[in-house]
């Protein structure tokens, strides 16, 4: 079970959230059998979608994150509900690329550094909200940070 910690200042002007998504990523790895670098990419997107899902107001609301980059993993997508339950997939789950020179997984090499991050929020009503930003780095966290810095929450 993934663990989430949410903190709110007493005047409700600042909110922080942290998540241990180890179990969720392990389950995705068990289901999809991706390579290590795609597991990292999918895990990052699952975690982000789950955290964004928890912030949704309606019980039937959902958020979809779709990363369409120019890397060999192809499209990586994750969908989460308002309880933080998430599921996802990578178009090409097995990508074998060398580690970075620092010994870390090359997530940006797998997903690509050029492309788009799409965020779709469905509140079950009229048209879903769809926003998008160009990829900044392909490291996923930086791309989502860029998106969040550009929208007005």
Go through the PLM ranges and name each one.
Residues 151-153:
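Conserved small/polar residues in nucleotide/adenosyl-binding loops
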Residues 48-51, 143-147:
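Alpha-helical scaffold segments in soluble metabolic enzymes
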Residues 135, 139-140, 145:
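Long, charged interaction segments in nuclear RNA/chromatin-associated proteins
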Residues 125:
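Gly-rich Lys/Arg/Thr-decorated short loops/hinges at beta-loop-alpha junctions or inter-strand turns
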Residues 2-120, 129:
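N-terminal functional module of multi-domain proteins
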């Amino acid at each position: 079970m993934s663990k989430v910690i949410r903190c709110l200042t007493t005047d409700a002007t600042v909110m922080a959230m942290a998540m241990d998504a180890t179990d969720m990523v392990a389950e995705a790895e068990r289901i999809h059998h991706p390579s290590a670098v795609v597991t990292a990419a999918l895990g990052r997107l699952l975690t982000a979608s789950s955290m964004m899902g928890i912030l949704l107001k309606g019980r039937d609301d959902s958020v979809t994150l779709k990363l369409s980059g120019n890397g060999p993993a192809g499209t990586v997508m994750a969908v989460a509900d308002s309880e933080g339950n998430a599921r996802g997939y990578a178009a090409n789950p097995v990508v074998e690329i060398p580690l970075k020179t620092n010994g870390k997984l090359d997530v940006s090499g797998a997903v690509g550094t050029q492309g788009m991050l799409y965020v779709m929020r469905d509140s079950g009503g009229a048209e879903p909200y769809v926003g998008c930003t160009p990829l900044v780095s392909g490291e996923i966290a930086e791309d989502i940070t860029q998106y969040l810095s550009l929208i007005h929450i």
